[in-house]
Amino acid sequence: MVEQAKLSDPNAEYTMRDLSAETIDITNPRGGVRDAEITDVQTTMVDGNYPWILVRVYTDAGVVGTGEAYWGGGDTAIIERMKPFLVGENPLDIDRLYEHLVQKMSGEGSVSGKVISAISGIEIALHDVAGKLLDVPAYQLVGGKYRDEVRVYCDLHTEDEANPQACAEEGVRVVEELGYDAIKFDLDVPSGHEKDRANRHLRNPEIDHKVEIVEAVTEAVGDRADVAFDCHWSFTGGSAKRLASELEDYDVWWLEDPVPPENHDVQKLVTQSTTTPIAVGENVYRKFGQRTLLEPQAVDIIAPDLPRVGGMRETRKIADLADMYYIPVAMHNVSSPIGTMASAQVAAAIPNSLALEYHSYQLGWWEDLVEEDDLIQNGHMEIPEKPGLGLTLDLDAVEAHMVEGETLFDEE
């Protein structure tokens, strides 16, 4: 058997027989921090504009990683359920641990839904741990950096979301005062003309009202910003086609989720019926689900939500698949700074990143959850060079904004 050290010695003598798989000793302990073990996994929920689920992974190397699962109930219990599958494992084996959790939870819904969201939060925290152990930013763990900053689009709301003029005024304000050059408004708002919203059919006056919103915003903003509009899976295929057709003259950035997310055949028909770009993806899980949108080119823009779809590496894989069809990625995001930065790290590392969503511009303390300042400036996120995600959780701020009944991480 040839030892590893002998293979590295230019003066060592050995035969080709010595190099056979049966005779080479390939044992090479990683050593040092690379032999770290996971000791604990904890969660807490923060009462933001959504109930954000923060995840902490602890190691015997003294390094703690922070992640975020997609908001809502259930994930914390699932993460607690998965903790025994992680304790004692090496946190650097991110891809193996991801598949390990999927397999372990295969009888409990690991193909999609809350289990994948919970795994996503753990996976993000593992990237934070790995970056800190290896002293590299998280983007280096998913391919390296294409850009130093990521374009951010701001999801906007007004007190009267059905008022076209109110939407136009808010769009102008955010562009002029906050510096964004990309914004989004909702179109699934009441028009006052509905007869039966349950059937998802849009009557002509309803479509006219939505066109009025689009016209008011795009004319007010002009060339200063790209403007997208979100439908939240609200309409029939026929209604979606008619609406998209009516918007073709307004050069909208994209129309998002016009039909329910389950039937990708209908989604393809809508997309191929119009020159209005169609964006879909936040309600579709893992690379397997996204593939059924990308391969038939049922979308013009893919919009996965990283803390929901499977985490950082899964989003990178989705972006690679999208790139095969020349489809850009505009990540959906309603997260705290943790999930947002995880998304930004991946957006920096993929060639086809279009923009990243920001959904908390009206929440004054969003940035207080971390010690770093000025995360978003003039509609862009600069990617930090610090190890891991590059953010430090402010535990005092987390405690101040926890969901009632939650407890803070036990850092002892």
Swiss-Prot record:
Keyword vocabulary terms for this entry: Lyase, Plasmid
Q: Which reaction does it catalyse?
A: D-xylonate = 2-dehydro-3-deoxy-D-arabinonate + H2O
The membrane spanning regions, by residue number, are none
What GO molecular functions are on record for this protein?
xylonate dehydratase activity
Q: Which Pfam families match?
A: MR_MLE_C, MR_MLE_N
SMART domains in alphabetical order: MR_MLE
Superkingdom to which the source organism belongs: Archaea
Which Enzyme Commission number(s) are on file for it?
4.2.1.82
Query: Which BP terms from GO are recorded?
Result: amino acid catabolic process
Question: What happens in the null mutant?
Answer: Impairs growth on D-xylose as sole energy and carbon substrate.
Instruction: Identify the CDD domains for this entry.
Output: MR_like
Induction behaviour:
Transcriptionally up-regulated by both L-arabinose and D-xylose via the pentose-specific regulator XacR.
| Enzyme class, UniProt record, top EC level | lyase
Q: What does this protein do?
A: NADP-dependent D-xylose dehydrogenase involved in the degradation of D-xylose, a major component of hemicelluloses such as xylan. Catalyzes the third reaction in the xylose utilization pathway through dehydratation of D-xylonate into 2-dehydro-3-deoxy-D-xylonate.
Listed under subunit, the entry gives: Homooctamer.
Protein name from the UniProt record: D-xylonate dehydratase
Starting at the broadest rank, the lineage of the source organism is: Archaea, Methanobacteriati, Methanobacteriota, Stenosarchaea group, Halobacteria
